[in-house]
Amino acid sequence: MITAYIDFKSLDCFLALRPILKLAADCETLVSWQPYRSKQRALPTEVASESVTQTHHRVRAESERRLQQHYAELRELDIDPSRGQMDTSAALGWLAGLEGDTSSFVSRLFAAHWIEHTDINDPTFLEELTANCGLTRVHSTVNLDSIEREAEERGLFDAPTFLIEGQMFMGRAHIPLMRQLLTAGGDR
């Protein structure tokens, strides 16, 4: 099993979705989707007298955004970067309250947020999507702080993060290594 910690407002999570679903299908394993509110870093602005640390943070943030945009363009996705600034806590809490294979729900929710620009925190929308995916909501109240605290105790600090056989993989760059682990007789 792949445990995937995601945040719907994270473009990196959205870009990791299709490769993770393909990995799971190829390796005949399930994905357990778990909520984790990522900390969106604001793009620092250049100042006249910035320190080396400030320069590093600014250049790194700019590089991350260019790389995300590059991969979005390769998939012919027209991405509005402002979608990454929206709070998706209600949708994450809803996900945590569902029972069953939530992969279709997660896929549709990411598309609704990033492509269709839908308010994914809207309870009516979430109820309809849950029904359309054949899922059941078993918990109407979820403590995201508690879920995140437990994840952080395991070493998690951002999304997307994936757990396979107790090993943690931060970011989508590790998907080839995850494939190697799963195909070498690992967890199925």
Set out the residue ranges of the language-model regions.
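Structural alpha/beta surface segment adjacent to cysteine/selenocysteine redox centers
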Residues: 12-112
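C-terminal cap of thioredoxin/glutaredoxin-like
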Residues: 3, 7-34, 100, 104, ...
